[in-house]
Amino acid sequence: MEHNYKVIDATSFSIDEIVKLVNDQYLSCFNKGETKHDYYCGITNNLDKRMEEHRCEDFEIVEDRVFAWNCENVDVAAEVEKRLGKLGFDIGDTKTLGNGGVENSTIVYLLEKGKAVNS
């Protein structure tokens, strides 16, 4: 299922600026009393495909709202994801750089996690 999520061009932004954009998006659109751990941040090279994988394998996406920023390269995206994890967002498995993202995973995304799949 294709959703055509809007991806903001952040290729000219610094890591700090992108982290601030993501956190500000959380504060303005979400932040209904949940903790940041109720929100998932990740990186991908195909937003529609990754969101479908989350829906099928991980969790529902509340109101199908996903915010995304395209970074200059995978190193920037992975560092943004890492810093968001330090701020308290759920970033998944942290054993690998970019949590398994591939070399062209330049899109950082934010969503509110819904009910876990198979729960």
Regions found by a protein language model. Give the residues of each.
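GIY-YIG nuclease catalytic motif and its immediate N-terminal context
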Residues: M1-I91, K95-S119
